[in-house]
């Protein structure tokens, strides 16, 4: 029985690996690796340090993906050969193969996840904004807890988190924060986090220890490259400088060079107060504005598309995507995919890959169903 079952598993692994190879294309990755090596060998490579870092990160991602594909190919081939030569009575070898299959499945699952990241902007860095909802200090503490969750997730991914703007609460937590998450496919992984996150718990700020419900809104945007043209006219901008303010502590870098930019036609406002010079803050704020304007254009196109399709969507800033219940029981549930876990401590410490994976699979399935209709 074990032999028949494991043979079937090895055949399934081969099929899944071939599907992954069709999408990720080892040949294209090999070609891209050569191009990236060529870029890195150019004399002026380090002139733009930000772009140089992006090239290095991309090269690391391509090389790791290629190595995983090569190792998987070897492992599956070895398993296929072992299946053919192992007798049914050799239970020790079958047991060893069972463990090897589990290991191959783990790596294959990682690569399958990458196949869902094929959107035009998925490979980009991501701007992540968290805004506390109504509810005073409790809501601000919840926003801060989410901020820590995403920072821990990014650390585990090897991503860099650059603070762009933050407004601390007077008592605890934060009213809002914007960061730039830098790393390959940061936007692709994080895009499904956009929406409203709801917390239910006994509030540590309530002397009567009552249960409170708090909300925080998460917004995710791709960082826009210079080669993507978003027209921003100087006459459409209102630029103000101000002194960074807040409750002090770890978040606030006191400076007279903070910059706030308002895009007059749309009313979009962005600010940056973390850099030491006004020029740097202005540059970072303009980059963020560009991302917001791009997101606005994409939203308009999406709405137009929905009109043509005759569909209505409830996805938006006010859409609740996930609930985090800490009391009277412990459960975190994604309201779109149905994925849930009772291990709230791990999730709040950045273990959100299962939620990200379930969203990407759910979205791919929805798109497949839509294209078939």
UniProtKB/Swiss-Prot annotation:
InterPro entries assigned: PCRF (IPR005139), Pep_chain_release_fac_I (IPR000352), Pep_chain_release_fac_I_sf (IPR045853), PrfB (IPR004374)
Gene Ontology MF term list: translation release factor activity, codon specific
One Pfam family per UniProt: RF-1
Predominant place of localization: cytoplasm
Primary role: Peptide chain release factor 2 directs the termination of translation in response to the peptide chain termination codons UGA and UAA.
Similarity section: Belongs to the prokaryotic/mitochondrial release factor family.
Protein name, per record: Peptide chain release factor 2
Species whose genome carries this gene: Aquifex aeolicus (strain VF5)
Gene name, Swiss-Prot/TrEMBL: prfB
């Amino acid at each position: 029985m074990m032999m028949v079952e494991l043979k079937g598993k090895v055949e399934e692994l081969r099929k899944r690996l071939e599907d992954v190879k069709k999408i990720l294309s080892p040949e294209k990755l090999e070609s891209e690796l050569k191009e990236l090596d060529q870029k890195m060998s150019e004399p002026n490579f380090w002139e733009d340090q930000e772009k140089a870092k992006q090239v290095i990160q991309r090269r690391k991602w391509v090389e790791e993906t290629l190595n995983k594909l090569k190792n998987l190919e070897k492992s599956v081939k070895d398993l296929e050969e072992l299946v053919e030569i192992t007798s049914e009575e050799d239970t020790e070898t079958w047991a060893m193969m069972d463990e090897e299959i589990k290991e191959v499945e783990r790596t294959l699952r990682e690569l399958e996840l990458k196949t869902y990241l094929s959107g035009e902007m998925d490979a980009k860095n991501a701007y992540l904004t968290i805004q506390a909802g109504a509810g005073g200090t409790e809501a601000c503490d919840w926003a801060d807890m989410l901020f820590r969750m995403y920072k821990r997730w990014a650390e585990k991914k090897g991503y860099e988190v650059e603070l762009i703007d933050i407004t601390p609460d007077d008592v605890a937590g934060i009213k809002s924060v914007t960061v730039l998450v830098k790393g390959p496919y940061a936007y692709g992984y994080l895009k499904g986090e956009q929406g409203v996150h709801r917390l239910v718990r006994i509030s540590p700020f309530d002397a009567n220890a009552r249960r409170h419900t708090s909300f925080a809104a998460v917004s995710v945007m791709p960082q826009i490259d210079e080669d993507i043209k978003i027209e921003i006219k100087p006459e459409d901008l209102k630029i103000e400088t101000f002194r960074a303010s807040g409750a002090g502590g770890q978040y606030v870098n006191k400076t007279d060079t903070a910059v706030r930019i308002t895009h007059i036609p749309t009313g979009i406002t962005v600010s940056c107060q973390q850099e030491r010079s006004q020029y740097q803050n202005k540059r970072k704020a303009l980059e963020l504005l560009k991302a917001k304007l791009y997101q606005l254009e994409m939203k308009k196109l999406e709405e137009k598309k929905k009109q043509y399709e005759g569909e209505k969507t409830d996805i938006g800033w006010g859409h609740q995507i996930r609930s985090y219940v800490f009391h009277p029981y412990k459960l975190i549930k994604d309201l779109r995919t149905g994925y849930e876990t009772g291990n709230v401590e791990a999730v709040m410490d950045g273990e959100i890959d299962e939620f990200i994976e379930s969203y990407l699979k759910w979205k791919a399935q929805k798109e497949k169903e839509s294209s078939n209709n």
